């Protein structure tokens, strides 16, 4: 499987609850490479663009209000199959349906405060990475243990 990138965001509830290290650690232990990281409080414009697919849904305003309510940790992770694997690490959108061992299964109980966002497809990842990061904010590097992470 070819290396790909995904966008992951720790939402304001995850930041406020002190879960940044726990979540970062899960991605690092899995073997993915962090290529972009920043903390910011998103503007309404950024939030509306990010959640644009939900613009006509009744919960859109609540999503925008929540994601702009405090700091978010925005990240770009890279690795073989990272998009699908990250979705498995994150767990179901509704935390009460998320499996134990997943981020949401272990750390969240309410859909409106589900701690983390992850891109769901390559096209979404590309859009979200471009929305949240400038190309100059992403690092292209090779971990010293790369040979121990993947074959070939």
From Swiss-Prot:
What domain of life?
Bacteria
Q: Name one GO biological process term.
A: UTP biosynthetic process
| Recorded coiled-coil stretches | none
Q: Which organism is it from?
A: Synechococcus sp. (strain WH7803)
**Cellular component GO terms, alphabetically?**
cytoplasm
Binding annotation for ATP: 11, 59, 87, 93, 104, 114
Give the record's subunit note: Homotetramer.
Q: Name its cellular compartments.
A: Cytoplasm
HAMAP family referenced in this protein's UniProt entry, alphabetically: NDP_kinase
Catalytic reactions of this protein = dZDP + ATP = dZTP + ADP; a 2'-deoxyribonucleoside 5'-diphosphate + ATP = a 2'-deoxyribonucleoside 5'-triphosphate + ADP; a ribonucleoside 5'-diphosphate + ATP = a ribonucleoside 5'-triphosphate + ADP
Which residues does UniProt assign to the signal peptide? none
**Primary location:** cytoplasm
Query: What is its biological role?
Result: Major role in the synthesis of nucleoside triphosphates other than ATP. The ATP gamma phosphate is transferred to the NDP beta phosphate via a ping-pong mechanism, using a phosphorylated active-site intermediate. (Microbial infection) Catalyzes the phosphorylation of dZDP to dZTP, when the bacterium is infected by a phage that produces the substrate for the synthesis of dZTP (2- amino-2'-deoxyadenosine 5'-triphosphate), which is then used by the phage as a DNA polymerase substrate.
Record's protein name: Nucleoside diphosphate kinase
User: What's the cofactor?
Assistant: Mg(2+)
Q: Write down the EC number.
A: 2.7.4.6
**Catalytic positions?**
117 (pros-phosphohistidine intermediate)
What the entry lists under SMART domains is as follows: NDK
A GO molecular function held by the record: ATP binding
Show the stretches that span the lipid bilayer: none
Q: Per the record's keyword annotation, is Cytoplasm included, yes or no?
A: yes
Pfam families membership? NDK
Provide this UniProt record's keywords sorted from A to Z. Answer: ATP-binding, Cytoplasm, Kinase, Magnesium, Metal-binding, Nucleotide metabolism, Nucleotide-binding, Phosphoprotein, Transferase
Give the protein family.
Belongs to the NDK family.
Is Transferase a UniProt keyword of this protein?
A: yes
Q: In which pathway does it act?
A: Purine metabolism
Q: Which InterPro entries match?
A: NDK-like_dom (IPR034907), NDK-like_dom_sf (IPR036850), Nucleoside_diP_kinase (IPR001564), Nucleoside_diP_kinase_AS (IPR023005)
């Amino acid at each position: 499987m070819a290396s790909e990138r995904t966008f992951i965001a720790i939402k304001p509830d995850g930041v406020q609850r002190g879960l940044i290290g726990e979540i970062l650690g899960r991605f690092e232990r899995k073997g993915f490479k962090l290529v972009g990281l920043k903390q910011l409080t998103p503007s309404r414009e950024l939030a509306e663009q990010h959640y644009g697919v939900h613009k006509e849904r009744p919960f859109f305003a609540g999503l925008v209000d929540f994601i702009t309510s405090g700091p978010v940790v925005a990240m770009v992770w890279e690795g073989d199959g990272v998009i699908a694997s990250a979705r498995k690490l994150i767990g179901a959108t509704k935390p009460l349906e998320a499996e134990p061992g997943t981020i949401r299964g272990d750390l969240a109980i309410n859909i409106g405060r589900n701690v983390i966002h992850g891109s769901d497809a390559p096209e979404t990842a590309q859009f979200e990475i471009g929305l949240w990061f400038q190309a100059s904010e992403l690092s292209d590097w090779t971990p010293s243990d790369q040979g121990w992470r993947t074959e070939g």
